[in-house]
């Protein structure tokens, strides 16, 4: 989480610098933070994986009303969500490294 806060701080500094260069005043925004959005996305990925695992366990135990095609679809949704999360993380790390390597 420290890396996420570092990225958020860097982005805020860049935005303040860009606004100052354009002659605009900097003011705090009351919108949701980048870190908050990232945390919410990670929670949704985790929830989707948990739901798929629970449904697979119910199917394995033979509970009625749980079809194999529903289990497989939910498992694929969870897998795609995780892969997307990993790709977003990789892009964020690459962007952070690029920003940190810039000369001021």
From Swiss-Prot:
Q: Record keywords: Transmembrane included?
A: no
Tell me where in or outside the cell this protein is found.
Answer: Bacterial flagellum basal body
Q: What are the protein's UniProt keywords?
A: Bacterial flagellum
Q: Which Pfam families match?
A: FliE (PF02049)
Q: Which GO terms describe its cellular component?
A: bacterial-type flagellum basal body
Question: Does the keyword field hold Disulfide bond?
Answer: no
One example of a Gene Ontology biological process annotation = bacterial-type flagellum-dependent cell motility
Indicate the principal place this protein occupies in or around the cell.
Answer: other
Molecular function terms in GO for this entry?
cytoskeletal motor activity; structural molecule activity
Q: Give the record's family classification.
A: Belongs to the FliE family.
Q: What is this protein called?
A: Flagellar hook-basal body complex protein FliE
Q: Which organism is it from?
A: Salmonella typhi
Whichever gene encodes this chain, its name is fliE
């Amino acid at each position: 989480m420290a890396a996420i806060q570092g990225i958020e701080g860097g982005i805020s500094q860049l935005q303040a610098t860009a606004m100052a260069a354009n002659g605009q005043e900097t003011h705090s925004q009351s919108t949701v933070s980048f870190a908050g959005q990232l945390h919410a996305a990670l929670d949704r990925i985790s929830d989707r994986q948990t739901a798929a695992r629970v449904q697979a366990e119910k199917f394995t135990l033979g509970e009625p009303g749980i079809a194999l095609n529903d289990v497989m679809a939910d498992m694929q949704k969870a897998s795609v969500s995780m892969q997307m999360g990993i790709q977003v993380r990789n892009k964020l790390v690459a962007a952070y490294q690029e920003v940190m390597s810039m000369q001021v």
